[in-house]
Amino acid sequence: MDAALLLNVEGVKKTILHGGTGELPNFITGSRVIFHFRTMKCDEERTVIDDSREVGQPMHIIIGNMFKLEVWEILLTSMRVREVAEFWCDTIHTGVYPILSRSLRQMAQGKDPTEWHVHTCGLANMFAYHTLGYEDLDELQKEPQPLIFVIELLQVDAPSDYQRETWNLSNHEKMKVVPVLHGEGNRLFKLGRYEEASSKYQEAIICLRNLQTKEKPWEVQWLKLEKMINTLILNYCQCLLKKEEYYEVLEHTSDILRHHPGIVKAYYVRARAHAEVWNEAEAKADLQKVLELEPSMQKAVRRELRLLENRMAEKQEEERLRCRNMLSQGATWSPAEPPAEPPAESSTEPPAEPPAEPPAELTLTPGHPLQH
């Protein structure tokens, strides 16, 4: 075991347990660092708090992405691949560890789909709770203390060597990737691959929402992002219409219109969803609003009104046939077994009415699909 090495960082000591291979990696911004870690208390028993090997999956962080526990980036960038080192970190670096640990444990229990990588968002919300849900972490949070981290560096990937998830991108990269995702979504929609298209739109929306949180609400840049988000949400709703998820369309479009009542396309898309679930009055009201805001859409509105009329007629015919079938079944007469010795005084009962004729088979024409 090498002697303790100072990293020129206050409150950090490093001891190399096993030397690594090769030169020190090039830890540029955006590099993905994959590693195993074990966290221990500085007590006599060196009590283990967390161990990624027990989870069975290593952890990774992205250099430069403001990881929750910033000191880990300092520790990792001092290591070579396959190196195992022990780091003693003073309280000034470990105060946030209980919150990080809670996230990691929940992920390990399958409560978070992002697995072992940890996003930077939502950190402030954690302080709103009086308990973290784990007794040992509550204790650490109440009484912060130095901790020991044993880390094995497994792999370092340059930004170009792996597919980066959108949440890993910088703000500038997010703005650049949004039009790419938008265009890819449009291309997939035209090919009829609506599930894939909706995923692209969702990914772009998440990027923009993340950027929007950094802006002051209702100011120029925030409104610019809001406009882009609404456009993508309406494209996403077009996919939902194709997937026949009409009530989700109603939810998204109504939310947009609550905040931005002048968006014509939102009324138009919502009208189509209303028509699909036979909300005749609501569909007509939305189409009327489209005409008020955009008279040039008169032709499209007339087409949707015709489709709505056809759908309502089909619905009425379907209901009429259903009622007729129910009445027909209710009127069906089935004679009971005659008594063995009918009473002498009983008169001959008149013959019962014959059962109603079954309704003729009617082939219902499916509703014409709404145009994109």
From Swiss-Prot:
InterPro entries: AIP/AIPL1/TTC9, PPIase_AIP, PPIase_dom_sf, TPR-like_helical_dom_sf, TPR_rpt. GO terms for cellular component: cytoplasm; nucleus. Pfam families: PPIase_AIP. One of its GO terms (molecular function) is peptidyl-prolyl cis-trans isomerase activity. Residues 53-145 form the PPIase FKBP-type domain. PROSITE patterns: TPR_REGION (PS50293). Keywords: Cytoplasm, Nucleus, Repeat, TPR repeat. Residues 325-372 are annotated as: Disordered. It is found in: Cytoplasm; Nucleus. TPR repeats lie at residues 178-211, 230-263, 264-297. Interacts with NUB1. May be important in protein trafficking and/or protein folding and stabilization. This is Aryl-hydrocarbon-interacting protein-like 1.
